[in-house]
């Protein structure tokens, strides 16, 4: 597990409480654009970053593990001299958040886990997807991915934004995407969920076909200080489809636990 220096952007009050935003497979830090104004206006120092293998972060050869992705977060906090942060992660980002909550709990004030899962099988599905991407590129999986990310109604109402997200996925380096599929294929976060001590907000999209509400329920049942919110209409990228609801939930959680 060797950390890489991931690409990041910091916005908001330099002295505000830090909030780290960690994104999904196939995304880059632009996926959090709907959260930035709400968090910075409320006085937070917002740190967004690209997962390794994604966006403008380095692409070391895979496979990656969640320990690798978690080590990148700890190294980023060290680089920014942040002792503890509020961590908000969606999907793969939420998995990274659970890893940090389990193995480096002292680095977290709170955890917000959006549209994620502690166990997302079958493993063969991730191996198959990685093989497709290595053979044909990320463009081969981008259209199917946006169909999981957004409800049909949202896609119909926002064709340009849907295309932009599809382009974001298609521009993700194939090796980075495939190597992160391996991290999901091999992850095992369930047994240690009770070790997460951070106050945890779990948010699920009611219409999410990728990490459905039942997965969020399992996390909320196992994490001692967790609370579950199911919101809709929203598919996998609920932070984009329902930014107002998600922002209010995040801000409420941070304020309750500062
Ligand atoms: O399959 C998808 O695109 C949904 C997803 C699973 C993990 C992740 O980060 O995104």
Model segments located where?
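Flexible "cap/lid" loop of the alpha/beta hydrolase fold
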Residues: 98-103, 107-137, 142
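Conserved alpha/beta-hydrolase catalytic His-Asp/Glu region
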Residues: 121-124, 136-195
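Conserved acidic catalytic loop of the alpha/beta-hydrolase fold
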Residues: 68-85
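Gly/Ala-rich beta-loop-alpha elbow adjacent to hydrolase catalytic centers
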Residues: 89, 93, 97
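Catalytic histidine neighborhood in serine/cysteine hydrolases
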Residues: 217-237
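Catalytic histidine-centered segment of alpha/beta-hydrolase-like enzymes
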Residues: 234-243, 247
């Amino acid at each position: 597990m060797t950390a890489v220096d991931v690409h990041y952007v910091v916005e908001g009050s330099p002295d505000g409480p830090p909030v780290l935003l960690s994104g999904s497979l196939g995304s880059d830090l632009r996926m959090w654009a709907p959260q930035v104004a709400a968090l910075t206006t409320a006085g937070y120092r917002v740190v967004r970053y690209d997962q390794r293998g994604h966006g403008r972060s380095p692409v070391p050869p895979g496979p990656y593990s969640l320990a690798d992705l978690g080590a990148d977060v700890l190294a980023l906090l060290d680089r920014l001299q942040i002792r503890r942060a509020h961590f908000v992660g969606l999907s793969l980002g939420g998995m990274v958040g659970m890893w940090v909550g389990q193995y480096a709990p002292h680095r977290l004030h709170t955890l917000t886990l959006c549209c994620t899962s502690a166990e997302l099988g079958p493993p063969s599905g991730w191996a198959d997807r990685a093989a497709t991407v290595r053979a044909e590129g990320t463009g081969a999986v981008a259209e199917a991915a946006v169909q999981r990310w957004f409800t049909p109604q949202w896609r119909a109402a926002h064709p340009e934004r849907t295309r932009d997200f599809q382009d974001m996925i298609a521009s993700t380096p194939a090796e980075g995407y495939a190597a992160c599929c391996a991290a999901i294929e091999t992850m095992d976060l369930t047994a240690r969920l009770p070790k997460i001590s951070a106050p945890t907000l779990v948010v699920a999209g009611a219409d999410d076909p990728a990490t459905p509400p039942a997965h969020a329920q399992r996390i909320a049942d196992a994490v001692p200080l967790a609370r579950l919110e199911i919101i809709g209409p929203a598919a996998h990228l609920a932070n984009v489809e329902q930014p107002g609801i998600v922002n209010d939930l995040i801000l409420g959680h941070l304020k309750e636990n500062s």
